[in-house]
Amino acid sequence: VKQLRNAALIAGLCLLHSTLPVNAQTPPPPDPTEDRLMLSAGFLSAHPDLRFRLHGLEEFKAGRHEDAFKFFQRASFYADKPSQGMVAEMLWNGQGVAKDPALAYAWMDLAAERGYVGFLGLRERYWSALSEADRERAIREGEALYAKYGDAAAQPRLATVLRRERRKITGSRTGFAGNVQIYVPGPGGFEQIDGSKFFDERYWDPKQYQAWHDSIWTKPRIGRVSVGDVEQLPEAAPSSRIPVARPEVDAAEPQTPERDESGLGTQKDD
């Protein structure tokens, strides 16, 4: 069961626009993590949620679970719900970190904060397996997690980075101009990216960026394999069991090992 659930969640982490409904009224923007030129142009440095999630995936797939855990925590600092779900799974299974079911529940509760179905299912599975003592500790631990990693604290951090990095890339504080072109060094010289693609508002406007993620993760493909109770959600899943905590927007950012980022996100599985 552990292997199936991890495989499902890892697969979900690798999916972006492919999970969107085919009848969506507004077509999704191109997946930036599937475009080598966009990654080379510095897209990931401006999107730390995706950047550190990709690092976490690479470390996890390489079997370096301890470092993967650190990268998923850092992505979580920037409101990345899939990474919060991976932190929970690793705590639940004892991968790269000591097994801690109570803390795992708190992280999965956090991952389910926006009502994403896959994470809600895992959260309820965790809860049903906890002892009464672990349930009490999960709620206590969860308050501190929400203060640091909940949307009230993490989304303003991400919004600050998106706005700052967009100004840097365009070279102007007036915002994006439609005729901006981006040049990326390649094997045959410089290659050009159309600015209208790179600067799609859904990548840079904080509210639209969250809505883009919501459209991907609200009903993703995770939790749709045979992992028992994950598939059995009540019609109205309960809201968070953890009390509201005062957000700590200025909390210290988790630290991660240095890694070569030149090919980050460009290596595909065989």
Residue ranges and their predicted role:
Residues 7-18:
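Bacterial N-terminal signal peptides
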Residues 25-39, 50, 120, 130-257, ...:
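Extracytoplasmic and endomembrane cell-envelope/extracellular-matrix remodeling and assembly machinery
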